[in-house]
Curated annotation (Swiss-Prot):
GO cellular component: cytosolic small ribosomal subunit
Primary gene name: rps14
Residues reported to bind Zn(2+): C17, C20, C35, C38
Protein's job: Binds 16S rRNA, required for the assembly of 30S particles.
Cofactor(s) demanded: Zn(2+)
Molecular function GO labels: rRNA binding; structural constituent of ribosome; zinc ion binding
UniProt name for this protein: Small ribosomal subunit protein uS14
Organism this protein belongs to: Picrophilus torridus (strain ATCC 700027 / DSM 9790 / JCM 10055 / NBRC 100828 / KAW 2/3)
Amino acid sequence: MQIKLEPRKNFGHKEGCVRCGRKRGLVRRYGIRMCRQCFRETANQIGFRKYS
């Protein structure tokens, strides 16, 4: 008996950070598509504010 293996689906998460290309820790909310490190560095320039 042979089992047929199918390739895993990627679900569209193959794109990395638009700034550095990292694929882990992505912030995709609001269409930002940045890793969390790049988001922390550029959040003020984008228009996000830190409250505390």
